Every structure is written in C-alpha cells, then in structure tokens.
C-alpha cells in the first residue's frame, strides 16, 4: 500500500467542535506528570520550579539561542571538533553532533529502545485458521459484529501509515537527540509492522482490500479523524519549517501532543476495546492477539512521547505559557469529541457487551490520564474506567497470551506500565 499524502485532505474535512469542558477548569501552570517509565524523565534536568526561576525571565538568553540553527546530523564533517558531552545534548535545537549516540543523556529513551527490541513479534507467527473458519461461517458472527470488525481495521490500516509518515518526514528531523532518534526509528518500524498485521488479517479472512484500505476516504467518521491528524501534523513536514523560534518550537510541541496524546493515545482506543472484546468471547482470537501486541507497542509509543514532550517543556519553559496550555487542553478535548462521535457511529446498538455510553465514559477516563500526564488539569469529574479488563490485557507480566492462543515470553515486558 502506498503511503498517504498530506494533500489528500483539507481542513474542511474536520468537524470543528469545541467541547464545553475545555474551559470548565483552570489550567495548571507548569506542573509535569511524566509517563511511567523505567527512569523518571526529570532525572536529566533540574526540577521544574527551579527551571522557572532561572529561565522564564531569561529573554535575552533565549533570543541569543534563536540566532543558531539546530543540527540535523547531515552537516559536513568538521575535523578536530570537540567531543560531545552530556551537557551539550538537548531534545530540540541541539548544536552538538547528532551522529554520536553516546554518551547518553536520556537513559530512559535508550531503555525504551531496548525494551521495544526485546518485545519484537511478527504477524505471520500467529495462526489465523480459527478466525478464517469463523468468518466463513454465515452464522459465526452477526452483521453488527462484522461491521465493527471491518470498521476498526479500516481506521487502523491507514492511521498507522499516517503515524509513520509523521515520524519519518517530520518528527525525526526536528528531535535533535540521538538516543531519542534511535527509538523513533524503532517506532517507525513498528508502525510498518502494524500495517503488515492489518494486511495479514485482511488477506487471511479474504476481506475486500479496497473496502478496508479506502475506508478513511469513504466513511465520514473515519475520514474526520484522519483529516484531524493531517491538519495537526502536516506543517512540520514542510522542508522550509525550522525550529529555533518560540512560535516554531510551540508548533513542534503542539504537533507532538496531537501526535502522541491524541492520535496514539485516544484515537485508537475505541477500536482496541472493540477488537479485544472479540478475543474475550473466544471469537477471532488470532486477530485479537495481534491487536494485543499492537496495543502493547502503542502503549510504549505513548509513554515515550509523553516523556519526550515533558522533557522539552522542562528544557524550554518559555514555551509552556498559560495561553499555550489552554490551547493544548482544547486540542485534546477536541480529539476526545471526535472519538466519541466515532464510537456512537460504529455502535448505534449494543454489541459484544459494549455500548456507546460506556465508550464515552472510557474516553473521558483516558482524556483525564493524558491531561494529567502532560501536567494539565483533568476535565471530567467522577469518571472511572468501565473496562478494567483492559488493564489485564495490557499487563505484560505474564507467560501466556491473554487469549491463550500461544505461549509468549517477554524478556523485558515487565518494565512497561499502562499508565
């Protein structure tokens, strides 16, 4: 399948709707709640309150910094240049040599890369025979179940291509730290692997490839989400876009929040719950097992992205203004509204023990998690997780796959945590 082009969508595809909750609570100032990781993100920088005192009023220093362009790793060789030190490294706008992986500054990024490599899997390892038999049985699944399954595949199959495009064509270019770039390369491979998995499921079940892979063009609620992703990420792929000014750096930070907190952290979760619900009922267990592994990968992508965003905030506190925080809060809530619309469209009736109201509660629960991880105020009071079994599926500290279709051993999977 060819990669998707940013020109395929215009802003008109996105339904603009600002949820009332976006302004219902005050935004926190600079509190940071890092994603759970093997090493705290703040371990490499000074505490946020000290960073504020030293940097928020340092306009002259920031203007001096803006005079220099960041390295890309493609600069001409400079013989006899000084060796890279840890202190010279930074997440964005770094002028140190990006081709030198060590010494590490962000050890958490390197550990996530190692964990991802240890959790490697391939779609064709998973037996789809039972899925094929069930799908071919005219009485095996209801029409609603078949629609939900195909709708989820339709969004997933192109969304991971959009994610890969943004990683390769935009994010990698502007993150100026080699250990983080190392993880981004692994993430890009995993996005390709996920697209491979969707193709493997489609081919195994004999589904109409055109129907599945064109759903992002032909089904409005899928198109709305894809268009939203493109609208919030395409600017960074412009060859003329450069970081180094407050406006440009905030554009990058906004892209990362839209990319990780919303696209990776919200837009996939209705589909994840729906697909995994089949496996819980011993239906389509081969496909559900692959979705479980994809969910595991995506949870690591999300945690890495949150840690990277928080690191940028700590190193560049002048970017994290009250006005910018309000914009990011509204951006996340806009994504939640789109995903709620998607849930209601895909589940007009209760199926698999699920219904649209449960998904609305779940998405608000997820949104509170994302807001808190970024140091923003939670917007939905009294919300609990209506799908506690999702935590069991995501928990990697086990020797057997959740659906018991094959034995798996995760060497370092226990280092990961859903939160």
Please give the residue ranges for each predicted region.
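N-terminal intrinsically disordered, low-complexity tails
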Residues: 6-63
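Intrinsic structural disorder/low-complexity segments
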Residues: 53, 65-68, 304
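Membrane-interacting alpha-helical segments
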Residues: 61-81, 145-147
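Amphipathic alpha-helical packing elements
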Residues: 71-135
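Non-heme di-metal
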Residues: 136, 143-419
